[in-house]
Amino acid sequence: MAKVVVERVYSIRLRHKMKRYPRWLRAKKAAKYVRKFLSRHMKVEPENVKIDTAVNEKIWERGAEKPPTKIRVRAVKFDDGIVEVELA
């Protein structure tokens, strides 16, 4: 098992990014934005960010057109460069 290097809790605003996309694309873009946000803040590549299914289900909970306006997640970075994301 890899050793935990950093553990942080983030509140990610989604509303300001999702308003620019058509309604039918918003949940998909929100999920991609969460990955991009965490890769930037945890200083890893986007493919090294592993998002828990609970986070994805929370984004898609109200359908593709109405993702949540913000989401609170816990990100854990391991010494091998993998970041695991779960709901906080």
Swiss-Prot record:
- Asked if the Swiss-Prot or TrEMBL record annotates the protein with the keyword Ribosomal protein, the reply is yes
Among the entry's GO cellular component annotations, what is one? cytosolic large ribosomal subunit
One Gene Ontology molecular-function label: structural constituent of ribosome
Give the record's keywords alphabetically.
Ribonucleoprotein, Ribosomal protein
Which InterPro entries does the record cross-reference, listed alphabetically? Answer: Ribosomal_eL31, Ribosomal_eL31_CS, Ribosomal_eL31_dom_sf
Instruction: Spell out the SMART domains in the cross-references.
Output: Ribosomal_L31e (SM01380)
GO terms for biological process, alphabetical: cytoplasmic translation
Supply the PROSITE patterns for this chain.
RIBOSOMAL_L31E
Which Pfam families does the entry mention? Ribosomal_L31e
Which PANTHER family does the entry link to?
60S RIBOSOMAL PROTEIN L31
| Family the UniProt entry places it in | Belongs to the eukaryotic ribosomal protein eL31 family.
Q: What is this protein called?
A: Large ribosomal subunit protein eL31
Species the sequence originates in: Archaeoglobus fulgidus (strain ATCC 49558 / DSM 4304 / JCM 9628 / NBRC 100126 / VC-16)
